[in-house]
Amino acid sequence: MSLEQEIKQIVESCGAKLYDIETVSDRGKTIYRVTITAPEGVDLQKCVEISNLISPLLDVHPPVSGDYNLEVSSPGVERKLKKPSHFEHSVGEKVRVTKNDGETIEGVLSDFRDHTLTLQTKNGPIEIPLDQITYAKTIFEW
């Protein structure tokens, strides 16, 4: 079983879902970031609970070489959309998509199937295959 699969099992045992795992560098420090979601939302207690369960696993199976900090958090209101499951769970939300050619499009994600998303824009619906997207995120309007 891969490290990601083991982390996913831990997250799900706590009533949450694994949204993403990434390793980032912030001000010279390496951060192993585990992002989770839950139907009732993610609070600090849930993050601490999951962090405390994942930490011993990472002590035995380090995710990166060298020093790192483990961070467990929610993806936030405005979240990156990378995986097909991210798009599937964001249907009905407003998103901003940057295509491979640099064009940026905003609209409501009305459908996602066969690795193609449909955005309802002010100029009508637009279909965009995932392989034409370099960056996508949800947008929260205050």
Swiss-Prot record:
InterPro entries to which the protein is assigned, alphabetical: Ribosome_maturation_RimP, RimP_C, RimP_C_sf, RimP_N, RimP_N_sf
Pfam families the UniProt entry points to: DUF150_C, RimP_N
Main location (coarse class): cytoplasm
GO biological process, one term: translation
Entry keywords, A to Z: Cytoplasm, Ribosome biogenesis
Residues making up the signal peptide according to the UniProt record: none
Keyword Electron transport tagged: no
Subcellular location: Cytoplasm
Keyword flag Cytoplasm: yes
GO CC annotations, alphabetized: cytosol
Biological function: Required for maturation of 30S ribosomal subunits.
Family: Belongs to the RimP family.
UniProt name for this protein: Ribosome maturation factor RimP
